Amino acid sequence: PKYQVYNNALLSVLSGLSFKEAVTDSKRWGQFFESAIGAYIISEAFVHRFEVYYWREGNDEVDFVLKKNQKIVAIEVKSNGETKTTGMERFHKLFNPLATIVVGENGIQPELFLSMDLRKLF
């Protein structure tokens, strides 16, 4: 299972890191970044009544799978500039989602994603 906080404040406090320390630790920053996007997705899911899952098979994974009325959308969060993952490619072959989205530097910019009405993805 994958644990997702509803608010990054808890994650931030428990890490004991300053902002500067977190930003310079690429692994930790990736966790904060993914968690912030996830918290937004969970909040939108509650308000707009869609389901959120995490998918993993072997080494392949998709960070967030959104489902509403039998339509699915796959979302991968990348803080390091990547845009393609084997997990997303495999998920697409297996489940043929309505959309596959990368949130990050070389995908949808985080600021834009965090202002989107996620219902429009379906």
What are these regions (language model features)?
Residues P1-N69:
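Accessory nucleic acid-recognition modules appended to NTPase machines
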Residues A22-D25, K71-A74, K93-N96, R119-F122:
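Short, low-complexity, polar/charged sequence segments that are solvent-exposed and flexible
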Residues Q4, V73-I75, I101-V103:
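Hydrophobic/aromatic beta-strand patches that form the interior of the parallel beta-sheet core
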Residues V62, K68-I72, E111-F113, L118:
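Conserved N-terminal glycine/acidic-rich loop preference
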Residues S79-L121:
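Catalytic cores of nucleic-acid endonucleases
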Residues Q70-E82:
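Active-site ExK catalytic segment of metal-dependent nucleases
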